[in-house]
Amino acid sequence: MPVTDFNWKALIIVGLVAGLAQVATGVVMYLAGIYFASWSMLVSLFVLLLSIVIGTRWYTGRYQEGEISYSQAFVVGIVISVSTGIVYAIYNIISISFFYPHFWDELLRISTERARANQQTPEAIASIRETVTANKIAVGNLIRLSIAGSLLSAFTSLTLKTKRARG
């Protein structure tokens, strides 16, 4: 299927909805006090996986007449992942800047505790405050969701394809 044969508007909308699901998950984890838990990234990855699977199935049924090849499912998953990452990055910048006044204090406290536990030097611990910014957090999450989502898409595409891949 040529790149022009995708319904890009529908794919972007699916990605935006997936991004909002990721934001809702982040908000719930933050309010529950588990956002900084070492395992919270697994929750985010699980939400991303669900978004890819549900989004690909919906797109297949609605725009592909129930049939999708491996390469098509892979592209759909990547679009969902990158769109999710963009929405979540924007959320990070806005929420850290305006809505979560204690985010930096919590992040610095936890980062410092982890650095001490890993026996990092006092200089490295002191540099945490200078190097962590909302933009770096946002870009890091965009990259993480895009790369992890692409890998998840590669695997889920194997099970979501409904016809022989042509390309």
Task: Label every PLM stretch briefly.
Residues 90-117:
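Functional transmembrane-helix hotspots
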Residues 21-29, 47-52, 84-88, 92, ...:
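Alpha-helical transmembrane segments of multipass membrane proteins
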